[in-house]
Amino acid sequence: MKKLLIANRGEIALRVVRTAQEMGIETVAVYAEQDRNAPYTQMADEAYLLPGDTNLQTYLNEDLIVDVARRAGADALHPGYGFLSEFPTFARKVIDAGITWVGPSPHVLEELGDKITACKVAERAKVPVVPGIAEPVSDMRVLLDFANHNGYPVMMKKADGGGGRGITPINNDDELRAFYMNHDALQGGDLGDYFIEKFVDKARHVETQSGRDSHGNFTVYSTRDCSVQRRNQKLVEEAPAPFLSDDVIAQLEGFSHRLFATAGYVGLGTCEFLVSKGKVYFMEVNPRLQVEHTVSEQVCGLDLVREQLDIADGG
């Protein structure tokens, strides 16, 4: 890896530029007009303008960014987080252009791209999931049967939700019927985007910062507790996650390993779990670097961007 394009902006672009330059890798930044004088464009070895007025025309423009990477002579591309970092179409275009994609493969991004398909990966890996129906249900009777068999409360969750979006708690039959009527696909609603899960009471939200290389070597860099939230948005991240028994830690690490191995995951990512009464339940995998990766760096003593670049380069 000799020349790296960072397909992002702001803090994460600056973060990747810094590490790449420490590794002796030339860096290429891309920017929309409003970011022309941003610190990351000044620090990078080269910077290219993305013409356009919106994110869709600039930072979300897959073909334009791949074309810039070609013109700049970049042999690798780091997507950062957000924007195109989880788009399998973009990853495939980068790879098809002969450029190293710093992240998991397009196939892995597809499998982990929404909560329903990710739960199916977990089931193949024999990792416990929260009791639920891991597919959209259009029959009201099926939803009511599930809720009454497992007990309220339950949750209706959007398959492509993230960051606390698309979660609706349901406490009784009337609320479930109201949700169904408001989202019924036959009336132009989005019921087909939702699945049902049992609500896990008094659960902690614990995640593992994990990595796996192309040789199958796996590690958990640290656990993180992100249970302190407001409106399902994380407020505080603590690493390592406190007050976990040895058995729970072993479950978290073992389940993360099985998830990565089953998916054929190569790169860094975050496995998210619910922990309740000594039991661990899979939630999702974030197949990219997360904003909070620096919390894990503080306790593991490693540069996780360097780890990403080493793994992508075959290390």
Give short role names for the model-derived ranges.
Residues 1-271, 275-296:
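N-terminal beta-alpha lobe that positions the nucleotide/phosphoryl donor
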Residues 296, 302-315:
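Catalytic cores of soluble metabolic enzymes centered on carboxylation/carboxyl-transfer
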